């Protein structure tokens, strides 16, 4: 009974506009930022290193290099603070967690684009 109630409550918190993407894909996350009384959209574009969790607890780790410094952020996928997630390009990788990219720089950190057939 309690699990049925939990699943009903969790289903109301899920978003239906989350695109299909995996680790290795370059994503652009639009985040709502509130500063005082104003609200603006901040974009964070980078490579998705991992997806973990399920349901309303699902999170993604996105990494980008900004002015020579690697920056990683963890975003809750179904958070109301995340305005939208766009897939910029698909990456061809063979792993679900790309933590090895943290030690690479320059051309070594590139991910080959996945070519999808019809």
From Swiss-Prot:
InterPro entries on file: Ribosomal_bL19, Ribosomal_bL19_CS, Ribosomal_bL19_sf, Translation_prot_SH3-like_sf
Keywords: Ribonucleoprotein, Ribosomal protein
GO BP annotations, alphabetical order: translation
Gene3D superfamilies: 2.30.30.790
Family: Belongs to the bacterial ribosomal protein bL19 family.
PANTHER family hit by this protein: LARGE RIBOSOMAL SUBUNIT PROTEIN BL19M (PTHR15680:SF9), RIBOSOMAL PROTEIN L19 (PTHR15680)
Cited function: This protein is located at the 30S-50S ribosomal subunit interface and may play a role in the structure and function of the aminoacyl-tRNA binding site.
Name of this protein: Large ribosomal subunit protein bL19
Source organism per UniProt: Salinibacter ruber (strain DSM 13855 / M31)
